[in-house]
């Protein structure tokens, strides 16, 4: 769910998911998809594509279990769809950490209507 995702992002990046990524670029946060503005925005684009593959669970509301051991996210979920959702969230949190140097404040509250048609997943 959104709660686990937010926790993972905070653990990996040290940033608050809502205030730092909630409306970043064309792909972070709710709604729109568009051509990514930078590597950080591409992380969110790939994450949305990952979520599109989930068929038996709801990424907004369904909860899963994971642990944080030795600064690593471990998806412990038995349910296959929830485990896949956990892996999607883990991947975006790591991607955002790996691309912290591309984070650009000018995309923090980006006007989504300026986004061009998205790439396909």
Curated annotation (Swiss-Prot):
Keyword RNA-binding attached: no
Tissue occurrence: Expressed by the venom gland.
Cystines in this chain: 26-115, 28-44, 43-95, 49-121, 50-88, 57-81, 75-86
Region (Important for membrane-damaging activities in eukaryotes and bacteria): 105-117
Keyword terms of this UniProt record: Disulfide bond, Myotoxin, Secreted, Toxin
Any Pfam family: Phospholip_A2_1
Gene Ontology biological process terms in this record: arachidonate secretion; lipid catabolic process; negative regulation of T cell proliferation; phospholipid metabolic process
Record bears the keyword Secreted: yes
Compartment(s): Secreted
GO molecular function, one term: calcium ion binding
GO cellular-component term (any): extracellular region
Assembly with partners or alone: Monomer.
Role played: Snake venom phospholipase A2 (PLA2) that lacks enzymatic activity. Displays edema-inducing activities. Is myotoxic. A model of myotoxic mechanism has been proposed: an apo Lys49-PLA2 is activated by the entrance of a hydrophobic molecule (e.g. fatty acid) at the hydrophobic channel of the protein leading to a reorientation of a monomer.
Family (UniProt): Belongs to the phospholipase A2 family. Group II subfamily. K49 sub-subfamily.
Protein name: Basic phospholipase A2 homolog AppP2
Species annotation: Agkistrodon piscivorus piscivorus (Eastern cottonmouth)
